[in-house]
Swiss-Prot record:
Organism: Chlamydomonas reinhardtii
Database matches in InterPro entries: CIAO1/Cia1, G-protein_beta_WD-40_rep, WD40/YVTN_repeat-like_dom_sf, WD40_repeat_CS, WD40_repeat_dom_sf, WD40_rpt
One record GO biological process: iron-sulfur cluster assembly
KW Repeat (keyword) present: yes
Record carries keyword Transcription regulation: no
Repeat (WD) residue spans along the chain: 14-53, 63-102, 107-146, 152-191, 200-240, 268-306, 319-352
Keywords: Repeat, WD repeat
Family: Belongs to the WD repeat CIA1 family.
Protein name: Probable cytosolic iron-sulfur protein assembly protein CIAO1 homolog
Gene3D superfamilies: YVTN repeat-like/Quinoprotein amine dehydrogenase (2.130.10.10)
Taxonomy, superkingdom: Eukaryota
Length: 352
């Protein structure tokens, strides 16, 4: 019997096609979803309790002409960025209770696969099928200017995410690699590539995320059915769980990354792992092509050890009726999980 249970507490319907991505607002009081139906839906809850009913408070449409693949909140929670297969990114702002499109970012040659806002809200990163990573800077007058384009990947780029410091950008893609980008005062350059024959994932890397507590470990998931945990080569052999946030980052400098694969988690998934998210509780949730959701954690709650033993602590078989495309923990209530799927539904789960 699993030590924890993911209890279903809600199913949100309304999209007319597969739901690709979900994202919680920084305050955790709203959830954005995007779909093949070319819309974004904003979900709000009537009462501040996880089991209360969530409802669709806004529909953002008439912007993109093809599938919306990714959605990201600004750090303030007052703006959204949406990335589409129509090769554009839209920026929306909430004003007097109404969402308004205020900018459109054009430049990618074809499908944009992911969008991510940096921690101070000044930069937006995007990536796409054209093998590129773009970095955009917010300018006065609700304008955005492309300040750099990186062509380091040899194939489709699936995901981008920022380190919490904002000093490091991570991209991952169809070429089986993860690239770490840093800024030298003039441009962004590739500081490290994770992967390659025998040193990383053996197939497409679909998603990446940082450990929100130590901020020094990176997790990735792949078409090769595994998760990999990357940490600094200079990391200590163990860090007490009672240590202050960031203590485990000893030896890790975001502007000078030097990561290695410390743990490979295998045997838990039978099909592609499309998404993962690391909660402050230490649990990593995953969503896969077997329609399942898993929550994995290190077996020891006292030590964070490189190469430590990890286990599957909760599993929901057939959590959806089709591929689970995205899983995200709520930032304000770390036991509340959202998932979305090719079945067109968003589901909410409570970890017990």
């Amino acid at each position: 019997m699993d030590p924890f249970t993911l209890e279903p507490i809600g199913a949100l319907s309304g999209h007319d096609d597969r739901v690709w991505n979900v994202a919680w607002s920084p305050q955790g009081d709203m959830l954005a979803s995007c779909s093949g139906d070319k819309t974004v839906r904003i979900w709000s809850r009537r009462q501040p309790r996880p089991s209360e009913q969530w409802y669709c408070s806004a529909i953002l449409d008439q912007c993109h002409t093809r599938t919306i693949r990714s959605v990201a909140w600004s750090p303030t929670g007052r703006a959204l960025a949406t990335a589409s297969f129509d090769a554009t990114v839209a920026v929306w702002e909430l004003s007097s209770g109404v969402w308004e499109q205020v900018a459109e970012l054009e430049g990618h040659e074809n499908e944009v696969k992911c969008v991510a806002w940096n921690p101070d809200g000044r930069l937006i990163a995007t990536c796409g099928r054209d093998r590129s990573v773009w970095i955009w800077e917010s300018m006065p007058g609700r304008e955005f200017e492309c300040v750099d384009v990186k062509q380091g990947h040899s194939q489709d780029v699936k995901a981008v995410t920022w380190h919490p410091s904002g000093e490091l950008l991570v991209s991952a893609g169809y070429d089986d690699t993860i690239k770490l980008w840093t800024y030298d005062g003039d441009e962004w350059g590739c500081a490290q590539t994770l992967g390659g024959t025998g040193t990383g994932h053996e197939s497409t890397v679909w998603d990446v995320c940082w450990d929100p507590v130590s901020r020094a470990r990176l997790a990735s998931c792949s078409d090769d059915l595994t998760l990999r945990l990357w940490e600094s080569r200079a990391a200590p052999t163990s860090t007490p769980a009672s240590a202050p946030a960031g203590a485990a980052a000893a030896g890790f400098v975001p502007s000078r990354p030097d990561l290695r694969c410390a743990v490979t988690l295998s045997g838990h998934h039978r099909r592609t792992v499309f998404s993962l998210d690391w909660a402050p509780t230490g649990l990593i949730a995953t969503g896969d092509g077997d329609d399942s959701i898993l929550a994995e954690e290190e077996a020891s709650g006292l030590l964070t050890q490189p190469g430590g033993q990890w286990g599957c602590w909760a599993r929901v078989a057939k959590a959806h009726g089709a591929d689970v495309n995205c899983v995200r923990w709520n930032p304000a209530e770390p036991r509340l999980l959202a998932s979305c799927s090719d079945d067109g539904l968003i589901r909410l789960w409570w970890l017990r």
